[in-house]
Amino acid sequence: LDKRVAELHKNNIRVRFIGDRARFAPLLQKGMTEAEAKTADNNGMTLVIAVSYGGQWDMAHAAQQLALQVQAGQINPQAMTTDDFQQLFQSQIQMSDLPPVDLLIRTGGDFRISNFLLWQAAYAEFYFSDLLWPDFNEAALDAALESYANRQRRFGRTSAQVEAHHA
């Protein structure tokens, strides 16, 4: 881990781990925390590494954190609108400080998201490839990006609504 983090740091890449770290040995947890701290100020790219992560776990964990805040009297759910709650919930999920997912590439020929980034990928565009991950190369990435570039991002709106908004 140290060797890889040094290389990532040298290339101005920020490292983030998402998932249930409590399932790992304390030494590995410490290594994850140190890697994030060492690269925290890097702004070239962000590498997000999912460890013991599941979208359902992520949302349940966020709900649990909010329930604890309600119990402590820090949040009054009766005084909140649905939009307020949605923003508060968003602040508790993993990757809350990162932009939403734009493109999710699924390799291996499967047509499912497999419990991955359920909240964060709400308006993501999906690209499915028959290639297995080890075989997914630069040409395959270019094909995925080209497909993405030719799509109309609607974010829950109809094509007519998007076109009217841009007119």
Protein language model regions, located:
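Flexible, compositionally biased loop and terminal segments
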Residues: 1-167
